Every structure is written in C-alpha cells, then in structure tokens.
UniProtKB/Swiss-Prot annotation:
UniProt keyword terms in alphabetical order: ATP-binding, Cytoplasm, Disulfide bond, Nucleotide-binding, RNA-binding, Transferase, tRNA processing, tRNA-binding
Catalytic residues of the enzyme: 101, 197
Pfam family, one: tRNA_Me_trans
Gene from which this protein is expressed: mnmA
Classification via HAMAP family: tRNA_thiouridyl_MnmA (MF_00144)
Keyword rRNA processing: no
UniProt source species: Rickettsia typhi (strain ATCC VR-144 / Wilmington)
Site (Interaction with tRNA): 126, 337
Lineage: Bacteria, Pseudomonadati, Pseudomonadota, Alphaproteobacteria, Rickettsiales
Region Interaction with tRNA: start-end pairs: 147-149
Protein name: tRNA-specific 2-thiouridylase MnmA
Tree of life domain: Bacteria
Length: 358
C-alpha cells in the first residue's frame, strides 16, 4: 500500500477521498492549508476557506485515525492570489482567483510538502479524471458533467499531474455524499462551497477598496459610438457583459463592452457589440503536445466555468500566444478569465484571455 497525502478542505469531497483511501489500506496523511484570516471568516457558511472548515477537516482526520496538519499560507496567499485579484480588477479584467490559487499555492506547495513527508501521491477531491495515455498522464473531465472541475486545473504541469490522483473523477456528487454517509462522516450533508474564500460577504469591491482605496475613482461612461452617457463609480464595479447597475438612461438596453483602465473609461453598447469572433490568450500551459507554428487545430474551448464548451480553431502566434477563433460568435468574452482547450473530454491546455478581436 502507498503513502498518500490528501488535501483536506473540510468539505465532503476531500473527506470522502481520505476515508476511501484509508479503507483501501493506504497510509493517509491529511493536510489543510490556512489561506486567509480565519478569525474574520468564522461563521461564513458558503466559502471553502472559512474557519470551521479547518475544524471539520481535523474532526474527519480524528475519526479516521490519520495524522492531520494545518499549514499557514496566509502571507503567500495574499501575495500570490489576493494582490493579483485586486490588480486584475484595476486593469479592467475579470479575474479567476481559484485558478491562480491552484497554480501558485495549492498544488505547488502541497506537492512539495507531500514529497517531504515521503508520500507516493497527492490526492484531491476534484471531479476530474487522470488517464494514463500513450505519452503519459492525461487530464480528462469528470464523468459527472455537472460537477466537472477541469476548467480550474488547466495550470497544473505534466510533472504535477503524474504525482496527483483524483479518486472522485468517476463519481457523481450524490455518490460522494452517499460514500461519506457510509463512513459516518458528519460532513456528508455539508453544503458545497460557493463564494471566493477571501470575500466574506460576496462583495469583492469591499476587499479591493480596503487594499486599494483609489479603486473607486470615478470616470466616464462612454458609448462605443463616441458620446458620453454618464459617470461611473470606479472600473472595479463593472465587468464585460454587465447590464444591471450602470446608472444611465438610454432608449435601449446597454451592456459593458470594454473597460479602458488607462483612461478610466467604461464603454457601453448594444448587445450585438458583445459578440466576439476571435481573441488572444497568453501564458498558455500545455498538458498535451504544444501546437506547432503555422498549425491550425480544431478544438473545443471553455471561456467560463459555467458555460458549455464551444467549437473553435486555435493557431500559434509569433510571441507564443494563441489565437482562438470561434466557429460561431460568442458573447461577453472577458479579459482575465481562462480559456481552457479540450479535445473531447481531454484537457489539452489553456491560457488567460488578454484581448478580443471582434
């Protein structure tokens, strides 16, 4: 049997993984990362990093009789994730902090810690599958499409993927809860996390204004045809595709279509102005063979975790960025979000949306 470290968040998924591996006879070690000021977050029920989650993880470990460690990563989390989140909004982007956390904190440091403990593998409760392919490990979507989390894991490296295991990849959420109940875990009916862990009340603007008070500097709201319509209360209050809360009167519905942080301008226009045919992604991470120069590849892409994949064609640009061309125009492609590239159920890679070419 193997020594396996389980990343325990205190939720039902990772708790079920720890119990399952323990029952199989593996030597299981639980690790929970303290990422935020839990004194503030205590009592928050819908975020993955609330203080009670550490307690829940510890209680599960005690019930199973496995060692459990809590690692304090608050400073690194602030520098790598929270500051990035704030800066992204100030640059007119719509950030995705959970992916940055996976890349810069969770997987990198958990894998290093697991290896220091002599573990053979690191297990998580993500709903994705690792499949041994001809050229090594491949990342595939979870069998439960409603819970698939592959979109959030595109930044892991091939080397990291070889070391990781995802025992819930073939499970549905119902089956996971049933398994946790079978093991008598108190977290079996615990609600799923919803909020960003460092946004206690779901209002990210409060967090940004606390760190960067200048974020609420007012500016102009301008129609894409060039005329001024009103004043905004800070670009952090707006995201691409937004319709509600613009505070301007017009004879037809208007949407945020562009944010210009350099000039502190929010541009609005009709819904048709949101349609995008192609865009550029940067900082691409490949979990399959990288696309070649002058090659065009037909793929599926996801531009939001909640959206279904859509058909596209990708090609490599001279600066190692990737151009993504939709077969049919898509709405509200937001810079700062991730674009994950698929071939069927396999994750080929992904990158960060940097700009749109309408």
């Amino acid at each position: 049997m193997a020594t396996i470290v389980v990343a325990m968040s205190g939720g039902v998924d990772s708790s079920a993984v720890a119990a399952m591996l323990h029952e199989q006879g593996h030597h299981v070690i639980g690790i929970t990362l303290q990422l935020y000021d839990y004194g503030i977050a205590v009592g928050k029920k819908n975020a993955c990093c609330a203080g009670k989650d550490i307690y829940d993880a510890k209680m599960v470990a005690n019930k199973l009789g496995i060692p459990h460690y809590v690692l304090d990563y608050e400073n690194k989390f602030k520098e790598s994730v929270i500051d990035n989140f704030v800066n992204s909004y100030l640059h007119g982007e719509t950030p995705l902090p959970c992916v940055q956390c996976n890349k810069l904190v969770k997987f990198r440091d958990l894998i290093n810690t697991a290896k220091e403990l002599g573990a053979d593998k690191l297990a998580t409760g993500h709903y994705v599958r690792k499949i041994n392919g001809y050229n090594g490990a491949e990342l595939h979507t979870g069998l439960d499409a409603a819970k698939d989390q592959s979109y959030f894991l595109f930044t892991i490296t091939r080397e990291q993927l070889e070391y990781l295991i995802f025992p819930l990849g073939g499970f549905t959420k119902y089956e996971t809860r049933k398994l946790a109940s079978k093991f008598g875990l108190d977290v079996a009916d615990k609600p799923d996390s919803q909020d960003i862990c460092f946004v206690p009340d779901g209002n990210y603007k409060t967090v940004i204004n606390k760190i960067r008070p200048e974020a609420s500097t007012s500016g102009k709201i301008v129609h894409i045809n060039g005329f001024e319509l009103g004043e905004h209360s800070g670009i952090i209050n707006y995201t691409i595709g937004q319709r509600r809360g613009l505070g301007i009167a017009y004879n037809e519905p208007l949407y945020v279509v562009k944010i210009d942080p350099s000039n502190n301008i929010v541009y609005v226009g009709q819904e048709s102005a949101l349609h995008v045919h192609e865009f550029i992604i940067k900082d691409v991470n490949w979990l399959a063979d990288e696309i070649k120069d002058n090659e065009k590849l037909a793929v599926d892409v996801k531009i939001r975790s909640t959206r279904p994949p859509c058909h596209a064609e990708i090609s490599k640009l001279c600066n190692d960025k990737i151009k993504v061309q939709f077969l049919s125009a898509e709405k509200a492609v937001a810079p700062g979000q991730a674009c994950v590239i698929y071939a069927g159920e396999r994750v080929l890679g992904g990158g960060w949306i940097t700009r749109n070419i309408r």
